[in-house]
């Protein structure tokens, strides 16, 4: 074995250790200064379990969002006293002791609105304000107004919000962008991280880390002042994602951090709890029971961690795409997450430089460079010719191509020759008449074929453009916009996901009905409208014919789903 080179390499190796120790202190400080609200399954114990198992409501999220009318301990005591009495009615007990969430009023757009006018009209409809909440409410208060996705999603969601904010910025609502960044900074200061959403039952996990990109977006309007203002919160979020790294040995994992055998540091998705999700209680219990060969707690953790990924659920996490109970999210190192961590490190370097701390900036650059090497070494499948996730159990890069493979291009972490191969793979395997497929596998899960999701369309479009692959990028935008326009023309709404095997149809699959609104679709649609139309002639609807200045590629024929990986 070679001895380590003296001097500079040893010194550089110390940098991450120093910075991680500082971050560990930040993480502890955040935990010590906040009181974590308890989720409803803990507050209500057996009552929560009994109500959810009784399936009193079509959507399990309904009772998770219900507000106790008095101290939960008193309600629970009353329940224990009454539950075995003759004639006890559980539904009546719930109606007396809880305030159920109200269904949002169905928005009816004015006649004759263009697509752009419809989206601009929706921003105030989707805006919420919860500076104060009821004492035992699962909803977490936020100091500023925020935009929700829509439908059953009555709270703000972490990674959704970035793509919503792109649209808000496109509409000139920089005040709303600033408010939402302030809200997420507030959550970092109070909870040590940004939860999945502002609900107590989401506090045990985060979502794809877009906060640094949100600050970077705000800096387009406010300049470096935004970077300087939110540097402390960006550092705290980084500490959350890297928590435990200082004690890791090669080949070990701790929470969200993975240390491979050669010392490479990467990240994975993780939820701190290993119980059924309150918002999907019955479904999770059924999934765990369907595979008696695995501990239920292991399945619960992997279900929760998949929710943390934003891809809940997908064949991407499963050994058998037709069986959800084979998912093992925590043993997979995701290419999209590590691309976002690379971007976070780059933005932290930029923000450190903005405050004049060049030494700290260099440390972040060192971390980003190390992660980029890790992405190229472990998250590139050379045999297939695309980026993919790394499997901690097989110690190999996985073979499946997913839309997550475009994230290294989105954050400018990809090697140029590999970006070219990604363009070919995308066009060959994922591009459909209605946009970009999430995967090429039909599993019945919502983050699989034939569904296409707005954030992935934008990541692919921007990522490919970053590397000069404009033709494929514009193909994706044009196909997806056509899908959105056709659906809007028919139904007068934008939806959460789309069937990309055709145009004009919303997506299916998953644990709940198709939702409309819809925050991230609105944001991406506005960005794409302004991408395909000349600035001197902005369009309010998708043009009937594709602009000749862009690619002249003909619409693709529908592809059959590819074999299960």
UniProtKB/Swiss-Prot annotation:
Catalytic activity entry: alpha,alpha-trehalose + H2O = alpha-D-glucose + beta-D-glucose
Domain of life, per lineage: Bacteria
Keyword Hydrolase: yes
Name of protein: Periplasmic trehalase
Keyword Coiled coil assigned: no
Species name: Escherichia coli O45:K1 (strain S88 / ExPEC)
Record's function text: Provides the cells with the ability to utilize trehalose at high osmolarity by splitting it into glucose molecules that can subsequently be taken up by the phosphotransferase-mediated uptake system.
Principal cellular location given in the protein's record: periplasm
